[in-house]
């Protein structure tokens, strides 16, 4: 069954990995604009983990957070950042340039060149600075910016391979120089990079369609089709509901996953990395999982299907989780729900108050 195979490939059933780096390397990229939620997306896919372990991997630079593949943040492993930027950096710049023009906040080449030199001065020597600290540094140098302009500037610096994520400060993300943060790696040709990206996606998101891969990768359809062709010997095809899906040869075609329940974070790969989400939830429930503006909510995953929403309530001494089901007649096993809530609380080193 499609969802059984997908649960295994996403490491949401019978997880194989213990370290955040192993997990992110397997997934290829994990969407991460909601920073805290993205850390949970990693943790919930590991055999056992904690927020501290994920934070340590980020601090060491084993995992990086940057704008890559599509115009949003993702977690990737350090070894993949340069070739992924080679594939996607130009497209992301184009998207942000278009957005900036619509907001009348274009950056001149003179401003960008001067700003990049200042970035190198501010961050040189393996420093990590928050966005606010960089804004303050620009101000001291006589370069006035605001929150929107500095964000646009930093995205461009990310996609040009000048900066990436640094070491968190007071739980806030920072920026660091990529050349100081990531040692030189073997370069990949564009063909090698395309094949590598397709392999990463289909091994960790299988079964998936070509349209799903186009959406996730940000590639043009022609180039995505070529990437799939480059690894065709590693892919099988199957029909699900009359649509052709690709399955990586390493997947378990006889997968049978029962008693699987997760509290998935907002923007989780299980939902957001596919163009067609009706394979895991009814269309009439889509608006409860994500809205027309592209905002995705925390959802409950039960036996391969998205069945409800959840939210935390940390006002009390113990962290509690409130749940609401799309279909109120569905009876979730209380032991599985308690186990999921307890792990979420344990991951965040907080006492569990179970759920209401």
Which ranges hold each PLM region?
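Glycine-rich, small/acidic residue-mixed loop/short-helix segments
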Residues: 283, 290-296, 300-356
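Positively charged, polyanion-binding regions of nucleic-acid-associated proteins
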Residues: 110-127, 190-207, 228
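Non-catalytic regulatory appendages
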Residues: 230, 234-285
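A short acidic, leucine-rich amphipathic alpha-helix
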Residues: 57, 130-139, 157, 210-214, ...
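Short, amphipathic alpha-helical interaction segments positioned at domain boundaries
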Residues: 84-100, 179-200, 204, 260-266, ...
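A short, conserved structural fragment
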Residues: 59-68, 72-73, 158-168, 232-240, ...
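Phosphate-backbone binding and catalysis cores of DNA-processing enzymes
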Residues: 1-129, 136-146, 320
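Loop-centered beta-sheet repeat module
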Residues: 147-225
């Amino acid at each position: 069954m499609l969802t059984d195979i997908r649960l295994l490939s996403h490491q949401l059933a019978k997880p194989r990995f213990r370290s955040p780096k192993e997990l992110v390397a397997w997934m290829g990229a994990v969407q991460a604009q909601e920073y805290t939620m993205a850390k949970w997306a990693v943790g919930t896919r590991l055999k056992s983990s904690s927020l501290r372990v994920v934070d340590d991997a980020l601090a060491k630079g084993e995992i990086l957070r940057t704008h890559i593949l599509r115009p949003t943040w993702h977690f990737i492993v350090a070894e993949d950042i340069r070739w992924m930027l080679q594939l996607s950096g130009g497209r992301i710049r184009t998207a942000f340039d278009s957005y900036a023009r619509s907001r009348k906040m274009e950056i001149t080449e003179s401003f960008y060149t001067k700003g990049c030199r200042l970035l190198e001065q501010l961050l040189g020597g393996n420093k990590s600075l928050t966005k606010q600290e960089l804004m303050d540094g620009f101000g001291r140098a006589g370069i006035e910016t605001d929150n929107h302009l500095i964000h646009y500037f930093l995205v461009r610096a990310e996609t040009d391979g000048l900066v990436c994520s640094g070491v968190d400060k007071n739980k806030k993300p920072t920026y660091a120089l990529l050349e100081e943060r990531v040692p030189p790696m073997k370069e990949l040709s564009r063909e090698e990079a395309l094949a590598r990206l397709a392999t990463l996606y289909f091994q960790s998101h299988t079964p998936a369609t070509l349209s799903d891969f186009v959406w996730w990768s940000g590639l043009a359809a022609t180039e995505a089709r070529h990437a799939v062709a480059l690894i065709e010997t590693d892919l099988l095809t199957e029909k699900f509901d009359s649509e052709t899906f690709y399955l990586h040869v390493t997947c378990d075609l006889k997968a049978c996953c029962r008693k699987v329940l997760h509290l998935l974070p907002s923007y989780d790969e299980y939902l957001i990395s596919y163009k067609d989400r009706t394979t895991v939830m009814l269309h009439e429930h889509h608006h409860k999982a994500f809205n027309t503006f592209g905002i995705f909510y925390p959802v409950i995953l039960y036996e391969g299907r998205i069945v409800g929403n959840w939210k935390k309530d940390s006002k009390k001494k113990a962290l509690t989780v409130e749940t609401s089901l799309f279909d109120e007649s569905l009876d979730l096993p209380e032991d599985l729900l308690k186990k999921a809530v307890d792990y979420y609380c344990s991951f965040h080193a907080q006492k569990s108050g179970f759920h209401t």
